[in-house]
Amino acid sequence: SARNYQQVNRILVSIGGSDTVGLTERLCKLLFAQQVFADISLDVVVGSAYEKITELTELIAARANSRLFVQTNEMANLMRQADLAIGAGGSSQWERALTHLPSLVVAVADNQQPGCEYLQHLGAIQYLGRVEQVSDELLLNAITEIIENKDLRQALAERAYALMAIAQNDASPSATPVLYSGAEKVARKMSFLSTL
């Protein structure tokens, strides 16, 4: 891929949809409070159902080099521009994989857990656990570690992309139902592929 893994200049935060667990705001506050992340741009994406949009808008407006996107159709571009994603499980993992975007992942629903654990096992994502169990300290440590580790980011991105390619090309979903259900969702989103 043409992606450069040298350093993290831009982070994409996209938890998906309404983010009822409040992880988006929590991540923003956490990142903004750390001087070490001051030079890193932040792109934050939420769905139109996101309830605390006023608070989030004010939070992001108060920090230079950060942008808020609500119900955007710019996702492919944002993924291409980012050097690291912090997101939830679910089908967006496959979109991130297609753009060689290394990801820190938090499960925000029970049904996301098996897929996240499986992709972590395969070395395709850095999975931090269920949102209720992920402390601020754990988030900060994981973000700091992955920002400082170019080889880890590249390995995650390349493994995720390779798995995506296998899942798309292999017509026999044998022992990996999680992988294939995810790939099928993305295969149905070919409009996303065409924008890459």
Regions from the PLM with identified roles:
Residues 1-196:
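Nucleotide-activated sugar donor-binding and catalytic core shared by glycosyltransferases
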